[in-house]
Amino acid sequence: PDLYARTYKFLEPKDYLNLKLTGKFASAQDAIALHWVTDNRDLNRVYYHPALIKASGVDQKKLPDLYSSTDVLGAILPEAARDLGISADCKVVLGTPDVQSAAIGSGAVDDFAAHLYIGTSSWLTCHVPFKKTSPEYNMATIPSAIPGRYLIGNEHETAGYCLTYLRDKVFYPKDAITPEGAPPDAYQRFNDLAASVPAGSEKLIFTPWLIGERTPVEDHTIRGGFFNMSLSTTRAHMVRAVFEGVAYNSRWLLEAVEDFAGRKIKALNIIGGGARSDLWCQIHADILNCEVRQVKDAVQANVRGVGLLAGVSLGKFRFKDISSRVAIQKSYQPNPAHRKIYDELYAEFKNVYQAHKDIHKRMNKTH
């Protein structure tokens, strides 16, 4: 209560930085959306909704004024320019949060053009010209940085983190067997191991729900595991199964996004740390049965996105020009030879969830 009473404004991290740069308290409609205090059903008139403000318990006077992500907030303060060593003539654009900036940096900015992010977590989304909520899939549209457009909001809790878990808790923990811990090239070794195993990992299935799942099912008690292990299962099989299990989960989400959007997605741009693996890109193309376009400098998609947003805001180019400004390093087509095994195992992947969800609910009911 004391902290609340002493607080003048509640700001998102980027909005605090903008305050230091310009002296202005401001937030963008897309950034404030996940505070659940705005009515964004009409993107031309986003405002703090009285009922939502009341439910939040926060005084509206403690919230910043609302703008568009593309608005120029103003010139940088002289002291900020001096501290940063940049020109005092620099303009400060309001900017956009993590997911929205990645969407722009992926180059998938047209309506229904999709991108897949594989990092610690993952998501698969596209811009759409409508607002919609799906309790079935635990998905809803959120305002994007592009005026008049929404993004389909969803998330997988653990994607690339499954490999981190494998590295730090299974293969290379600092214990009596591997006291030195993981080598610097651990992920490349994983990639090489996975490539040595045929598609389908000899029918070993990994489910990546290490801390539950959000979409296309909201289930905080489900947990991950390896299924169908045998005496012939090697750690190479386990590594490839992790690559494939994350991709099965991506396909599950893709199907939900397609149903939500009302159309098939035939190609998607892939970004994030996982996109640096050629093998993982190909596995995704095979399992999702669609073209996967590996964005160049995929890890920098978020930074590129805010840079491109600034370019639009300052009139250097238009949103429709962005896709041609984002380079595609390589395109991956589905391998028809892998279609049968991956379709079979994907069906069983979903069956594993149905067969085990009640068991996990009982086992993890206190979590």
Language-model region placement:
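Glycine/Thr-rich phosphate-binding loops that ligate phosphate moieties of nucleotide
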Residues: 2-7, 11, 126-367
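Short glycine-aspartate micro-motif
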Residues: 10, 89-105, 113-117, 123-124, ...
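Glycine-rich beta-strand-to-loop/alpha-helix junction loops that act as flexible
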Residues: 69-70, 118-121, 267-275
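Gly/Ser/Thr-rich active-site cleft segment
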Residues: 1-97, 163, 207-211, 239, ...
